[in-house]
Amino acid sequence: DILATTQRPTITADNFNDKAAREQPYFTENSMLYQSQFEPGSVMKTFLMASALDSNKVDLNASYYRRVNLYDVVINDWDANESEDGTFKLPSTVTFAEGFMMSSNAGMTRIVQNMGSDLWDSYLRRFKFGVPTRIGMGGEQFGALPDDNPVSQIQSSFGQGISTTQIQLLRGWTSFANKGEMLEPHVVSKIVDKDKNTYLESRAEVVGRPVSEDAINKTKELMVGVNTDPTWGTSYLTVESQGHEPGPLFMVNGKTMAVKTGTAQIAADTGGYMKGMQDNIYSAVAMYPPENPDFIFYMNIKIPASTWSLTYISDVANPLITRAEQIKNQEASPQDTSGLKAGKVTLEDYEGKAPGNVSDSLRRNLLAPIVIGQGTKVTKQSVAKGQEVGANTPVMLLTDGDHIMPDMFK
């Protein structure tokens, strides 16, 4: 379940028509959770590493040189890009495990080259990138898979040349918290009808098993290293900064989180990417507890007004997850259902309607839509009009496009 989401600049019922609120830089009426797509940057490396481990296409102990010539593109790591003469601040040859922890673009490039574009593309599809979650809210963006060329495929390994929504990232990361099983995000957990004395309650909805539990566990171990390794970890603070002592930045009650940091270039309206020193999207995903996460935290900051520091994110993550951990076993049910009976949902006639809109409608009633085919209209439905079903019932929708049967999960 999505427990909380927020964004700034914000819009509320109180300031909806306020001119000053609307004139804030980057103001939008859209939800950044699902109505905005962007190039996510290096947090995508979590999916690449899990995919490479699952397909046995990476040896974590093997070493590589941290510069790659790819056609007319030279892929450097961040420490070489930041130096005036292109020299490395860290060793020029590292292992793939070290490369992940230091967020090496060159290392991820070599992994994709070893996997091949077709295999990497198949894993992106297993994680359902390019596919909306259909959480029941309108205006959801689809994101986009990388173009079918070698450079775009390579760049997608470090989160450029591919676009996602925040909720698509979170859907993919649910597999890290569920032993490889991916869950569809839910924003409504329960619906109570006091007039009828009934309730509908959602349960976990498995929508994929993109990689093995072993691949997930090994990737999470590397993510712990991102936060705890004093040499390679990008969220390990080596010197005092912003009032923080040296050490891991993401901590709950003295225990580390599993972390991946990200920096993404932003596409310019005129083509190419923005060139300013801080014209980036900075981000981090943190999972706690790392061995079997109860909570997944993701935050990004676009073009920060002050000099960028990862502490801007850790200062939000640490107290928030600490508080969530404290109350997770105390949290009362949103609505007491004692004395109520399980409700039913009456199906409508969906034939001729857009499958996406139908899916949103079904999801709002805590049903589980399954779209078959790639068409623009529903031609048949598995549950007839007027039939009553309980919450979480799968409803298959056949479309007028190519009939591709999706994977089915319990």
Give residue spans per PLM region.
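Short, surface-exposed linear patches
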Residues: F16-D18, K179-G180, D193, T231-G233, ...
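Outer/extracellular conduits and scaffolds centered on Gram-negative outer-membrane beta-barrels
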Residues: D279, V285, S306-S309, I313
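Short amphipathic alpha-helical segments
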Residues: V211-K218, Y312-V316, A354
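Beta-lactam-recognizing serine transpeptidase/beta-lactamase-like catalytic domain environment
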Residues: D1-S42, F47-I301
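Ligand-recognition elements built from short beta-strands and adjacent flexible loops
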Residues: M299-I301, W308-T311, N318-K410
